[in-house]
UniProtKB/Swiss-Prot annotation:
Name used for this protein in its record: Chaperone protein DnaK
Modified positions (Phosphothreonine) in chain numbering: T197
InterPro entries assigned: ATPase_NBD (IPR043129), Chaperone_DnaK (IPR012725), Heat_shock_70_CS (IPR018181), HSP70_C_sf (IPR029048), HSP70_peptide-bd_sf (IPR029047), Hsp_70_fam (IPR013126)
Family affiliation: Belongs to the heat shock protein 70 family.
Induction of the gene: By stress conditions e.g. heat shock.
Region listing for Disordered, in residue ranges: 599-643
Domain of life: Bacteria
PANTHER family xrefs: HEAT SHOCK PROTEIN 70KDA
Molecular function in Gene Ontology: ATP binding; ATP-dependent protein folding chaperone; unfolded protein binding
Entry keywords, A to Z: ATP-binding, Chaperone, Nucleotide-binding, Phosphoprotein, Stress response
Source species: Parabacteroides distasonis (strain ATCC 8503 / DSM 20701 / CIP 104284 / JCM 5825 / NCTC 11152)
Described function: Acts as a chaperone.
Length: 643
């Protein structure tokens, strides 16, 4: 059985891990980093960049650099107006009222953008393992709705992954924290404040069982919001002084975002930071600079509403679990935003104990996902994960009331049936309107799907018996069926339409993603070949110079002829021509070397072999070093950085 990788698909950063010899390993990406920015950029010529390369060019390409896409996953266009106004890229209304990212007229769904990030994580794992990866456990915020979970699963499918399990992020973190503590009975609170979402989960650990007792949270509260209070403060200060709103200019907004994120991070370890943005915007033809000092106290004042918003979900989660703060043995901090000192302080004040800092908040979720992958393959034994559904599920009944079938914090998988009847005489069909939420009225909850049960025999109201069944799988994804007990007729729906994508659309996007991956592979091979040719040209010229007059003119001429052919093919980026010229150059150089060897009785120069590993180096890595060098010698080369 192949490896099942664990992926933390984050709002700000993503991380991938795998189980190796019963130990979870966080895998570094091609840039050598253990986390990858969840950023996708579209650049000239149709090329895509993902991760750090995308982040580096964001300021000069703000309208085609996509970040925080997780906040759009599984939501309708109307639900993400706040997010749309915060990002410099263009988001438009698509089919089924879904948000789509507009890149020069091509509309991308949030699932497609997320799939590009997942492809990067998949490739990272494949490079490390040396084998193809087809299965993954992907994490989501515990408070993600059914539509958001389904959208995440679709993103995995588009990326070419079979998503074996969707796991809640706090639950994954508890697995990573508690795997070596399975012989202890303890109650833990996992406080997970990431880049875009906040979750609090209360769990009981004992005898290898990880049981979630309750969960609560806010899917629109996270590091992005802390960035934006700084962005708004900077923009308002500049507008007060200069009369111009920087947030209306995409490039200025992107610079503000980068500066705000940097300032927020610095204020976790220092009490004051200077924000210095030269030439931020011309005003009346005069270039203006933005220079401000932000203290930790001022930042905490700006972000106080966000920090306080974390407490009510904690209080509700404890209440739902039937526990008090004194019952909690350990508080685990997860997510980069928990590094903010004011967040740590309020957690300690609420729970009455200092939170544990024994886990890496950026990596622990991916580690837990990898452990769950090991549970599924059988590598990890004697571990049972019992998760819950975060929100109540039900249907709309007469009078616009929501009738709950499954209450929030019910352990999953679970199945529940209830019998309903018709509201009017001779009603031939019923509409099953499926809802998710905690409010009493249907209109105040989230609509996640509708379907009809037709062919009900004519009868007085109250006579037909319609059995509605809700079935939630281990991924937290819902299936609903309705059965007319009189006729035995059944109609069912898997709640997929709420994500806005049909099966055909997912299939098409998957094929496009695979085609793009193949195109990316070919492009890399092309660049590798150009780099090999460049290396061979350099080595040949160097050896010709070293040989000098030792090489007879009649031997030197064919080498120079072949070298010129290689230079011309390299300049034209003619791959077939490069292959032919490299072969010819090797041949003539070897022939000349052999003749010199025979004439001198040994000690001839070898041919200018291109280093096969040279072209494969990532820009910014150890380019120019050959892994094939057995004597430790390294040839220094000039190269053009290619991304």
């Amino acid at each position: 059985m192949g490896k099942i990788i664990g992926i933390d698909l984050g709002t700000t950063n993503s991380c991938v891990a795998v189980l190796e010899g019963n130990e979870p390993v966080v895998i570094a990406n091609s840039e050598g980093k253990r986390t990858t920015p969840s950023i996708v950029a579209f650049v000239e010529g149709g090329e895509r960049k993902v991760g750090d390369p995308a982040k580096r060019q964001a300021i000069t390409n703000p309208e085609k650099t996509i970040f925080s896409i997780k906040r759009f996953m599984g939501e309708t266009y109307d639900q993400v107006q706040k997010e749309i106004n915060r990002v410099p890229y263009k988001v438009v209304r698509g089919d089924n009222n879904t948000p789509r990212v507009d890149i020069e007229g091509r509309l991308y769904t949030p699932q497609e953008i997320s799939a590009m990030i997942l492809q990067k994580m998949k490739k990272t794992a494949e490079d490390y393992l040396g084998q193809e990866v087809t299965e993954a456990v992907i994490t989501v915020p515990a408070y993600f709705s059914d539509a958001q979970r389904q959208a995440t699963k679709e993103a995995g499918e588009i990326a070419g992954l079979t998503v074996r399990r969707i796991v809640n992020e706090p639950t994954a973190a508890s697995l990573a924290y508690g795997l070596d503590k399975t012989n202890k009975d303890m109650k833990i609170a996992v406080f997970d404040l990431g880049g875009g979402t906040f979750d609090i989960s209360i769990l009981e650990l004992g005898d290898g069982v990880f049981e979630v007792k309750s969960t609560n949270g806010d899917t629109h509260l996270g590091g992005d919001d802390f960035d934006h209070v700084i962005i708004d403060w900077l923009a308002e200060e500049f507008e007060r002084e200069e009369g111009v709103d920087l947030r209306k200019d995409p490039m200025a907004l992107q610079r503000l975002k980068e500066a705000a994120e940097k300032a927020k991070i610095e204020l976790s370890s220092t009490t004051s930071t200077e924000i210095n943005l030269p030439y931020i915007m011309p005003v009346n033809g005069i270039p203006k600079h933005l220079v401000k000092t932000l203290t930790r106290a001022k930042f905490e004042q700006l972000a106080d509403g966000l920090i306080q918003a974390c407490i009510e979900p904690c209080r509700q989660s404890l209440k739902d679990a039937g526990l008090s703060t004194s019952d909690i043995d350990e508080v685990i901090l997860v997510g980069g935003s928990t590094r903010i000192p004011a967040v740590q302080a309020i957690v300690e004040k609420f729970f009455g104990k200092a939170p544990s800092k024994g886990v890496n908040p950026d990596e622990v979720v991916a580690v837990g996902a990898a452990i769950q992958g090991g549970v599924l393959t059988g590598e990890v034994k004697d571990v049972l994960l019992l998760d819950v559904t975060p929100l109540s599920l039900g249907i709309e009944t007469m009078g616009g009331v929501m009738t709950k079938l499954i209450e929030s914090n019910t352990t999953i998988p679970t199945k529940k049936s209830e019998t309903f009847t018709t509201a009017v005489d001779n009603q031939p069909s019923v509409e099953i309107h499926i809802l998710q939420g905690e409010r009493s009225l249907a209109k105040d909850n989230k609509s996640i799907g509708r379907f009809h049960l037709d062919g009900i025999p004519a009868a007085q109201r109250g006579v037909p018996q319609i059995e509605v069944t809700f079935d939630i799988d281990a991924n937290g994804i819902l299936n609903v069926s309705a059965k007319d007990k009189g006729t035995g007729k059944v109609q069912s729906i898997r709640i997929e339409a709420s994500s806005g994508l049909s099966d055909d659309e997912v299939k098409r996007m998957k094929e496009e993603a695979a085609a793009n991956a193949e195109a990316d592979k070919k492009e890399k091979e092309r660049i590798d070949k150009l780099n090999q040719a460049d290396s061979m040209i350099f080595q040949t010229e160097k050896q010709l110079k070293d040989l000098g007059d030792k090489l007879p003119a009649d031997k030197k001429a064919p080498i120079e002829g072949a070298l010129n052919k290689l230079k011309e093919a390299h300049k034209a980026q003619d791959i077939a021509g490069i292959d032919a010229a490299m072969a010819e150059l090797n041949s003539v150089f070897q022939a000349a070397s052999q003749e010199m060897y025979n004439a001198q009785g040994g000690g001839a120069q070898g041919g200018p072999q291109a280093d096969p590993n040279f072209g494969g180096q990532q820009a910014g890595g150890n380019a120019g070093s050959s892994n094939n060098s057995k004597d430790g010698n390294v040839t220094d080369v000039d190269f053009e950085e290619v991304k």
